[in-house]
Amino acid sequence: LEEVPNVLGFTPKKFWIYGHSLGGFLTIRLSSHSSGWWEKSMQGIILESPATSFPLIIEKKLPGRAVMASPWVRHILRREYQRIHPDLNVGYANAQIPYWGSPKVPILVMQAEDDETLGIDHYNLLKEHFSENSDIHVLSEMPHTSKVDVKERREILEKWLER
């Protein structure tokens, strides 16, 4: 993000961050801990079927008996996170909202009603913590993937950006 003004040749006055699935998780973090030029320019964030908890991802993705490897997986994740970000105190248990971050900017959420990838748990966690400053839409015709665009999603997004 620091390089955006250099790449564009100007500093954007209005700026939104879009995040889908795990990208939504990163968007929540970036917008909750903004710094640099985008702190003043950020108008809001757009989350599409976002992940909201690393523990929920790991618990859902470890099949059958692999659940017994959870402590090892948590150890590896924590070690690698601390290697990349030694300055941030994020552990496995607090790698979820609200600990991960709570954006203070407006939030548009477009959630697939039948989210075959993340299920409903991430959405429920988001709704529990971010309802106050969020415009939340559950779309029955939209799958989890961002490869498919549906008319309802487009209309919601365009209307929200025009406000």
What positions do the PLM features span?
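Conserved acidic catalytic loop of the alpha/beta-hydrolase fold
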Residues: 1-13
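Core-facing hydrophobic residues within beta-strands of well-ordered domains
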Residues: 12, 41-42, 133-134
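Gly/Ala-rich beta-loop-alpha elbow adjacent to hydrolase catalytic centers
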Residues: 19-23, 27
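Residue-level signal for short, function-critical loop segments
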Residues: 21, 51, 113
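Active-site signature of alpha/beta-hydrolase-fold catalytic machinery across serine-
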Residues: 29-33, 125
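Hydrolase active-site cap/lid region
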Residues: 33-88
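Serine-hydrolase catalytic core
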Residues: 84-162
